[in-house]
Each structure stands twice: as structure tokens, then as C-alpha cells.
Swiss-Prot record:
Broad class of where this protein is predominantly found: membrane
GO MF: ATP binding; ATP hydrolysis activity; ATPase-coupled transmembrane transporter activity; riboflavin transmembrane transporter activity
Binding partners and assembly: Forms a heterodimer with EcfA1. Forms a stable energy-coupling factor (ECF) transporter complex composed of 2 membrane-embedded substrate-binding proteins (S component, RibU, BioY), 2 ATP-binding proteins (A component) and 2 transmembrane proteins (T component) upon coexpression in E.coli. Stable subcomplexes with both A plus T components can also be isolated. This complex interacts with at least 2 substrate-specific components, BioY and RibU.
Protein name in UniProt: Energy-coupling factor transporter ATP-binding protein EcfA2
Biological role: ATP-binding (A) component of a common energy-coupling factor (ECF) ABC-transporter complex. Unlike classic ABC transporters this ECF transporter provides the energy necessary to transport a number of different substrates. Expression of the complex plus RibU in E.coli allows riboflavin uptake; uptake does not occur in the absence of RibU or the EcfA1A2T complex.
Organism from which the protein derives: Thermotoga maritima (strain ATCC 43589 / DSM 3109 / JCM 10099 / NBRC 100826 / MSB8)
Length: 266
């Protein structure tokens, strides 16, 4: 599914003393099968943008098109799964099974939820028999995150949105979470990430969009992002290119991904 965000603006508490402009004339395209990072400081409008994309809130103005068409919230949510920053915010059930099965029962009430729940739990690395009867609220941070993701991919959507998925995870937990992202990408499906931990996620994304005070200030490849926002990367890139030339290799014939890998491994 290709998503087009066209001149989207959003104002919270419009017409009241608490009025706040969260987004201002934001336009972007999210291509099918790509992994997009949405970056920016706290309050820049990242979460608001993705909630609009996921059909959870209506923009004040502008359009969001899905494969060129406007769709209602319910239709959108069948094709998009969004996991929030804090898994507890989306938990409601007393058993992991019921938590994960909710979307199946909601969108496809005639289907047997058991095989789909088992598939989703195994996809995120949770053993079905060991976890299906456990209480979601009493799991570890990493386990809660996995349950939250399983519950939004169980109905097999085209797009997975993860809002700050690395928060509260140790190094091993972050690695495990990013493995889930990579597995989702191998299915040819779209991933949209919000993360402040750019250094950890940058090698897993194709493109970066940066928001600042509700406006889009950057939209480009991860290579372009690093060159613009990380002066250390530019210096490292020049050194690596010089070494390649001295070794008789041509850095200018390499793709951005090949050169980026050389720089990151230098």
C-alpha cells in the first residue's frame, strides 16, 4: 500500500485557550515495502502524524490517500497496525491470547483466531504455549513490547507503525526488536518507525523524515540524513573514500548502501 500525506495540518483544542498547532502543511509519500524513520524532537508532531496515517485521528485539514484513495478509519485500521510507545496503553485483556486475538475477532469474526495468534506470537519470538495464558501487565518490558507488536500484526496488515519501540529496552532487547523489524521487511511490507535512538535504528531504515515544530524540514535517504545531521559521519565518509582510492577501489561506483556499510564498519 502506498500512502500519500498531502498538506496535512492538525490543531488540538481548536478555538479554545489550549489551542495547539501540532502539524503544519506536511506532505510526504510512504512507498510500499520501505522502512521509514520519522525523527524529531519531543513535541515536533511525530506521533500526531502517524496517528493520522493510522486513521486514529482526523486531520484538521489536508488529505491522506491510500493507493490513491481516501478511506475511512475502520478501513485504514484493517491494513495498518500501530504499536504505541508504552505497551500498557494498548493492553486491556487478562491473558496474552485474548490481547493478541482482539484484532482478528474485530476485523475477521468468522476466522479461527488460534492459528493466527500462534503465528503472530512466534513471529515476534514468543512461544505460544508458554505465553498464551500469562497476564500481559506482569511481563518484562521486552515481552510486553512483543505482545503489543503481535497484537497489531495478527490480522496481517500491510503496514506496521512502531512508536518509540526501543524505549526501556536493554541492548539485547533492542537487537531482538530490530530483528522483528527486519523480518517484517523481508515480507515486502512497510515499516514506519518513530525513534530518538537514531544511532541504533539508522542501519535498518531506507529513508528518514525529520519534523520540527510540526513542519517537515527534511526528507531523504539515510545517507543524505547522516551527511546533513551528523558531522562525524561526513568526516568518516571522506576517510573511508580516501582509503578505498588508495586501495585501488572506486568509491563513486558504489551504491549508497555499500558505501554506508563501509563507513559504519570503519
Amino acid at each position: 500500500m502506498r500512502i500519500e500525506v498531502v498538506n496535512v495540518s492538525h490543531i488540538f483544542h481548536r478555538g479554545t485557550p489550549l489551542e495547539k498547532k501540532a502539524l503544519e502543511n506536511v506532505s510526504l509519500v510512504i512507498n510500499e515495502g520501505e522502512c521509514l524513520l520519522v525523527a524529531g524532537n519531543t513535541g515536533s508532531g511525530k506521533s500526531t502524524l502517524l496517528q493520522i496515517v493510522a486513521g486514529l485521528i482526523e486531520p484538521t485539514s489536508g488529505d491522506v490517500l491510500y493507493d490513491g484513495e481516501r478511506k475511512k478509519g475502520y478501513e485504514i485500521r484493517r491494513n495498518i497496525g500501530i504499536a504505541f510507545q508504552y505497551p500498557e496503553d494498548q493492553f486491556f485483556a487478562e491473558r496474552v491470547f485474548d490481547e493478541v486475538a482482539f484484532a482478528v475477532k474485530n476485523f475477521y469474526p468468522d476466522r479461527d483466531p488460534v492459528p493466527l495468534v500462534k503465528k503472530a506470537m512466534e513471529f515476534v519470538g514468543l512461544d505460544f504455549d508458554s505465553f498464551k495464558d500469562r497476564v500481559p501487565f506482569f511481563l518484562s518490558g521486552g515481552e510486553k513490547r512483543r505482545v503489543a507488536i503481535a497484537s497489531v500484526i495478527v490480522h496481517e496488515p500491510d503496514i506496521l507503525i512502531l512508536d518509540e519501540p526501543l524505549v526501556g529496552l536493554d541492548r539485547e532487547g533492542k537487537t531482538d526488536l530490530l530483528r522483528i523489524v527486519e523480518k517484517w521487511k523481508t515480507l515486502g511490507k512497510t515499516v514506519i518507525l518513530i525513534s530518538h535512538d537514531i544511532e541504533t535504528v539508522i542501519n535498518h531504515v531506507d529513508r528518514v523524515v525529520v519534523l520540527e515544530k510540526g513542519k517537515k524540514v527534511f526528507d531523504g535517504t539515510r545517507m543524505e540524513f547522516l551527511e546533513k545531521y551528523d558531522p562525524r559521519f561526513f568526516t568518516s565518509k571522506m576517510l573511508v573514500m580516501r582509503r578505498l582510492v588508495l586501495k585501488g577501489e572506486d568509491p563513486f561506483s558504489m551504491s549508497d548502501d555499500e558505501l554506508l556499510e563501509r563507513v559504519c564498519n570503519s
